[in-house]
Amino acid sequence: MHLQTRAAVVTGAASGIGLALSARFARAGAGVVMADVDGDALHRRAAELTARGAQVTAVTADLTDPEVVERLADTAFDQLGDIDVVCNNAGVLGPVGQPLWEVPLERMRQVFEVNHWAHVLVARAFVPRLLERGRPAHLIHTASMSAFVVGAGSAAYAASKHADLAVARSLRADLRGTGVRVSVLCPGRVDTPMVQGLTAPRGAGGDTSVSAEDVAGLVWEALGSDRFYLFSNSDARIRLRDQFDDVWRHVSLPPPSPEEELWPAPKATTVTMNH
């Protein structure tokens, strides 16, 4: 059943997928809190949506700062009341085309702080509040096809997206049985300002391209469902098949030894508490 979306929070909302998500929610009549570190661009885009009748609030926020993220959560719940959707979407591309040993450590750290650490902070700030309210909600993590398929010269970005995929999978397990669903958005190439003028890293594959609006539509249709992986590009199946076929070809484990087959299971331990 599609989640009734009356209120949404979108990070990385000043451009690209984040802006398209904000516009999609606003068009459906939802109130939207838009957050981004680029305050000037964010307020321009929010003003454009407001001029079209949208109910949006723009919050300039450095999402790598735990205190800032906590204030964002407070502001969002104060403005919107109950929140139905949180799109954990902030991201940067970082250095592309450089081998790992040539990427400045500070640049790699910056990519991880935005693509991974900021997503952790947003989840830690919003999920407890969502659980406390006890209403259905949906957390969308924006990862990437680079969480699965890695090419040359993409160490910082791909590693950060692998980490974010792991966080999303862990959150899904942690929240199973609650009313908060989790999905991970894994777009391939999307026509956004972040990738204009770039070519795909060698070995990453992926020739198809979609619009940010296409991606926002995919997310909209998935709200309230149990779909975890959201793939936006038509070549995703081929790219994933090639990736995992390669893994499977290298799985050549020997049969277990008799000792391994008979290895005893751990014994239960009883602890007596003295009061």
From Swiss-Prot:
Gene Ontology process terms (BP): antibiotic biosynthetic process
Active site: Y157
InterPro entries found in the cross-reference section: HdxpentlteDhPtlF, NAD(P)-bd_dom_sf, Sc_DH/Rdtase_CS, SDR_fam
Record: residues binding substrate: S144
Annotated binding of NAD(+), by residue: 12-36, 161
EC class: oxidoreductase
GO molecular function: oxidoreductase activity
UniProt keyword annotations, A-Z: Antibiotic biosynthesis, NAD, Oxidoreductase
Catalysed reaction equations from the record: 1-deoxy-11beta-hydroxypentalenate + NAD(+) = 1-deoxy-11-oxopentalenate + NADH + H(+)
EC numbers on record: 1.1.1.340
UniProt feature coiled coil, ranges: none
Pathway: Antibiotic biosynthesis; pentalenolactone biosynthesis
Presence of keyword NAD: yes
Similarity annotation: Belongs to the short-chain dehydrogenases/reductases (SDR) family.
Function: Catalyzes the oxidation of 1-deoxy-11-beta-hydroxypentalenic acid to 1-deoxy-11-oxopentalenic acid in the biosynthesis of pentalenolactone antibiotic.
Protein name (record): 1-deoxy-11-beta-hydroxypentalenate dehydrogenase
Native source organism of the sequence: Streptomyces exfoliatus (Streptomyces hydrogenans)
Taxonomic classification: Bacteria, Bacillati, Actinomycetota, Actinomycetes, Kitasatosporales
